[in-house]
Curated annotation (Swiss-Prot):
Zn(2+) binds at residues 146, 149, 159, 162. The lineage of its organism: Bacteria, Pseudomonadati, Pseudomonadota, Gammaproteobacteria, Alteromonadales. Is required not only for elongation of protein synthesis but also for the initiation of all mRNA translation through initiator tRNA(fMet) aminoacylation. A motif ('KMSKS' region) lies at residues 332-336. This is Methionine--tRNA ligase. The gene is metG. Coiled coil: none annotated. It catalyses: tRNA(Met) + L-methionine + ATP = L-methionyl-tRNA(Met) + AMP + diphosphate. Gene3D superfamilies: HUPs, Isoleucyl-tRNA Synthetase, Domain 1, Methionyl-tRNA synthetase, Zn-domain, Nucleic acid-binding proteins.
């Protein structure tokens, strides 16, 4: 490279150590891995680290349920995660755990520095307490009736039915999820990080180019509402690190989790000697630091994390890059539909490079959700990788092997065409750098089309029949192999295993600059099939296996189980029922609600007027999949003002929640506005 090598540290969001990796998780890890492989191919000094997020109440309780220690559980889970990442060709330079000596030391260092600088405050708060388990209950470990709409079996932070948010202490008739006991209200002293003290610094940093514009704009809401002090402590019993100077207080998992980036890299530096930790983390560091994360953890990484680092006199990230979620066939990943696919289940049926390429073909630098349409997935991989790229080598290699002793020609048949392919490298490199992988794949496949068209026009299989045509055929097919080689250099960050096989076939080793050269008078090996086509039978077998996994994990349902869980309500008169005006409505539009975890905003067409309704169905439906559907709404429900806007009715749905919510659909013959009697 003409410029000096950059020093780069890349991290991925830490997977939580209480469950397996699924293909939704893999999106972010594949995105980061492609970017890292590109940087290394360019000759940059790029280090790629990650770790398991191994602390918190959920891990403590799950280990108790399994009858093992938390240490044993997180150890088993780490091995499982590392195996999945390795088999998906995610090439971490180091993978560690937040339950480590390095992480404890760094967490204590950061806390102590913040405390000495006056950024740690204490406050007595009221919390729900389980008297049987003798533990304070986090919001997701208490359930009760929603204080707004009265819906039963709702968690302690928000309602799945009406979308209301509240404190656990606001629940009616609360019960501990851990023991079923009625919790008590008790006081406890907690430790808080003074986030408001960093308001000016964060406003400047979030607009410095370190975040995507969508992220920076979203964070304005927090600044407008006013930053609040952040509770960084949890009461014993808790699986984590004890706060220095306390007897029964522990660091909240989200305090020591991002410090895991630092501790994983610290262990990597000390065990391998391949990098100097201070060079990448001290306040005056000139190295580049990038975090790849999901959009659901933006706040922790773009507010709390940079403020903690600033207050403890460490450097801030160069960029925090968020990605969206995945849907499968247009809807949320669903266990019942078999589209909640574990990474290991995928690997047992399909080549990981299929998914790596498909994700790359759809990923952009924006925070957009990505749909894994399984039919399109098979068609695109078969068309692009097998039908276009590999087909070039398949069409040319046989002639080289059989007619020319496996040696490429000394001359280039069409230097202008080869130069066009080579000149495309700068633009493709820029697209990789900017994480515009989708555009890069389109450009590469456009080149592949040109290469195939060149071979089709030259028809070497016909030309070879003509006497004296051997040299021309040799040069045509040799150019085809060189065009294929350039394409594989460009694809190397996406399909590393295929690239290794191609390098072996070509007797070559790639760097990014390999695209600027050609192989002439060069031996190649006999061509072997480099990739099999995606078979829909294998895709369907994967879906069936996912369904079977879900069935094996779900207890058998007794007859009338739904009625047992929620008995039929008290009898009402016909006059009472007649007061409820149920109408057929067409979903004219559906969209996400900024800041809402459960809600979608629906625009409902009643055949003469439109209504805006907020529905707690986000966990089960992709907005695009809802548009145009008929549904049923309560049309005369009094409008309800929510913090996201006015909700002018309610749509009807059934199901226990999460991905199992089913909106009611009238027969296609029904028309918007019709009353249901």
């Amino acid at each position: 490279m003409s410029q000096s090598a950059r020093k780069i540290l890349v991290t991925n969001a830490l997977p939580y150590a209480n469950g397996p990796i699924h293909i939704g998780h893999m999106l972010g890890y594949i995105q980061a891995d492609i970017w890292v492989r590109f940087q290394k191919l360019r000759g940059n000094e790029c280090h790629f680290v990650c770790a398991d997020d191994a602390h918190g109440t959920p891990i403590m309780l799950k280990a108790q349920q399994l009858g093992i220690t938390p240490e044993q559980m997180i150890g088993d889970m780490q091995r499982s995660h590392e195996s999945d990442f390795s088999d998906f060709l995610v090439g971490f330079d180091h993978y560690y755990s937040t339950h480590s000596d390095e992480n404890r030391e760094l967490a204590e260092t950061i806390y102590t520095r913040l405390d000495k600088a006056g950024h740690i405050k204490t406050k007595v708060i009221e919390q729900l307490y389980d008297p049987q388990k003798e533990m304070f209950l986090p919001d997701r470990f208490v359930k009760g009736e929603c204080p707004d709409c009265g819906a039963e079996d709702q968690y302690g932070d928000n309602c799945d039915v009406c979308g209301a948010t509240y404190a656990p202490t606001d629940l009616k008739n609360p019960k501990s999820v851990v023991s079923g006991a009625e919790p008590e209200l008790r006081e406890s002293e907690h430790y808080f990080f003074d986030l408001p003290a960093f308001g000016d610094m964060l406003k400047s940093w979030t607009r410095s180019g370190s975040l995507q514009n969508e992220m920076a704009n979203k964070l304005n809401e927090w600044f407008e509402q006013g930053l609040q002090r952040w509770d960084i402590s949890r009461d014993a019993p808790y699986f984590g690190f004890k706060i220095p100077g306390t007897e029964n207080k522990y660091f909240y998992v989200w305090l020591d989790a991002p410090i895991g980036y630092m501790s994983s890299f610290k262990n990597y530096c000390s065990t391998t000697g391949k990098a100097d930790w201070d060079t990448y983390w001290q306040a005056d560091s000139e190295a580049e630091l990038y975090h790849f994360i999901g959009k659901d953890i933006i706040y922790f990484h773009s507010l709390f994390w940079p403020a903690m680092l600033k207050g403890a006199d460490f450097r801030q990230p160069t960029n925090v890059w968020a990605h969206g979620f995945i849907t499968v066939n247009g809807t949320k990943m669903s266990k019942s539909k078999g589209t909640f696919i574990k990474a290991r289940t995928y690997l047992e049926h399909l080549d990981p490079e299929y998914l790596r390429y498909y994700f790359a073909a759809k990923l952009t630098s924006r925070i957009d959700d990505l749909d894994l349409n399984l039919t399109d997935f098979a068609q695109r991989v078969n068309s692009d990788l097998v039908g276009k790229v590999i087909n070039i080598a398949s069409r040319c290699a046989g002639f080289i092997q059989k007619k020319f002793d496996g040696r490429l020609s000394s001359n280039v048949a069409d230097s202008a065409l080869l130069e066009d392919f080579q000149l495309a490298g700068d633009n493709i490199a820029e697209l990789y750098e900017k994480r515009e992988f989708s555009r890069a794949m389109r450009d590469i496949m456009a080149l592949a089309d040109r290469a195939n068209q060149y071979i089709a026009d030259k028809e070497p299989w016909q030309l070879i029949k003509q006497e004296g045509s051997e040299q021309e055929v040799h040069e045509i097919c040799s150019l085809g192999i060189n065009l294929f080689r350039v394409l594989m250099v460009y694809l190397a960050p996406v399909v590393p295993k295929l690239t290794e096989e191609v390098q072996s076939f070509l007797n070559d080793n790639f760097t990014w600059d390999s695209h600027k050269t050609a192989l002439t008078d060069h031996p190649i090996d006999k061509f072997k099939a480099l990739m099999q086509r995606v078979e829909m039978d294998d895709v369907n077998a994967m879906i069936d296996a996912s369904k079977e996994e879900q069935a094996s994990q779900t207890p058998a349902v007794e007859a009338n189980d739904e009625l047992k869980k929620e008995p039929i309500a008290d009898e009402i008169s016909f006059d009472d029922f007649a007061k409820v005006d149920l109408r057929v409505a067409r979903i004219a539009n559906a969209e996400h609600v900024e800041g809402a975890d459960k809600l979608l905003k629906l625009t409902l067409d009643l055949g003469g007027e439109t209504r805006q309704v907020f529905a707690g169905i986000k966990s089960a439906y992709d907005p695009e999949a809802l548009k145009g559907q008929l549904t049923v709404m309560v049309a005369n429900l009094a409008p309800r003002k929510m913090r996201f806007g006015l909700s002018e009715g309610m749509v009807l749905a059934a199901g226990p929640g999460k991905d199992e919510i089913y909106i009611l659909n009238p027969h296609d013959g029904a028309k918007p506005g019709m009353r249901i009697m």
